[in-house]
Amino acid sequence: MPTLRIAVRKFDPFESAIRRQFADFARAVDHGAGLELEVLELNDLHRRLFEQRGLADGSLDITFLSTDWLAEAQAAGLIDDLTPRLARAPIADFPQAWSPSLLELQSFAGGFWGLPYHDGPACLIYRTDLLAEAALAVPRTWAEFHAAARRLHAPRLGRHGTALALFPDGHNSFYDFCIQVWSRGGDPFGDGARPRLCSPAAAEALEFLRALAADDAAVAPGAPELDSVKLGLLFCEGKVALMTNWFGFAALGERWRESRVKGRIAVAPIPRGTGYGGRSVSLNVFWVLALAAGSRQKELAWSFMRHAATAPMDKLTTLEGAIGVRRSTWSDPDVNRLIPFFHELEVLHEHARQLPVHPRLADIARVIDDLLAKATATSLPVESLLREAQERVERIVA
């Protein structure tokens, strides 16, 4: 009996959704195949796919792949171009059933490298009850965000104003820094991922993150140990009043059995900088299902990928606690009864920016991890820290 092997980013809704989707697939297609999942934390997943070459050696058939790893995987020949398979065995209503922003990041180097699976633009997530009790408006600037976090900070009640996810996994710090720079009218990278870190916007962004991280009257302790998942769970447990994080954690707060904040959650655009050029932006990073180049059962793998991309299975992804990627799911009445703000995904995507496409983006992200770690743990001038990071990234992309 064939066994489909899938590498999954550790997150309970991913695992439960894939298992249920495969069970539905098995009922619909009598192939007699089994399922084996490798559930891995973020850094372990990257190591399994790239350093250990699990995508090339035949030990995996499908993987969850973050869009900022796509160029690295494609350049190393680790994933298959899906264009020929879409031509031979197309997916119904592809591509019009998806927002263009969920198809662009996979379209490069003459191919299409992954099917969207889990969405989650970054956004402001907040407790409606706490803002109302404090007579606070929804923060529209970073200064207002910081002030609201201070106002709502109440450790004696087991609640912090906000929290930062600074665990050095090549994602959280990197994303937060890019959002901070963009929201101040800057751009941390140009064409080909050329760094633009020695700018007033980058300096202002780093100063803000340093000041926020140091403010124990606004921020939960332990930021270097928090990743986006742990931060999201803190919010769902009622321990954080507001945060910038992935939309999926707002949805989780409405669906998770152990949530303490159900019915008291709302989302809004990310705050902007206060200076000239300040604007609200989001970050478009999402998870795709990619076909392992070394898979020995690609027809079976593609058949399951097509099944998981159907409208009922995308809705199931959402009902399990992740975030579906089809427009039909975003507007689905059942989904919006459970998660009243789910339809706002379309609007959030209108403000979404993208990270540069580069095969060494993971290495660039580690430089920004180091930058944030030094900024929040030392008093070194931000200009010297940014100059050092600029030089390191220049060497990477040279």
PLM regions and their residue ranges:
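Hinge/lid segment of periplasmic solute-binding proteins
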Residues: D68-P121, S173, A268
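Conserved N-terminal structural module of periplasmic/extracytoplasmic solute-binding proteins
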Residues: M1-A71, P90, F94, Y276, ...
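Short, solvent-exposed loop/beta-turn-alpha elements that line the ligand-binding surface or hinge
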Residues: P84-A97, L166-P168, R184-E204, W256-R260, ...
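Extracytoplasmic/periplasmic solute-binding protein
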Residues: F108-A109, W113-L115, H146-P195
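Extracytoplasmic/periplasmic substrate-recognition and gating elements
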Residues: D215-A217, R255-I323
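Glycine-centered hinge/linker elements that transmit conformational signals in sensory
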Residues: A149-R151, G192-A223, I270
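Short helix-initiation/N-cap motifs at beta->coil->alpha
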Residues: V39-L49, W142-A147, P221-L233
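Long, aromatic- and glycine/proline-rich binding clefts that accommodate carbohydrate-like moieties
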Residues: A268-I270, T318-D370, K374
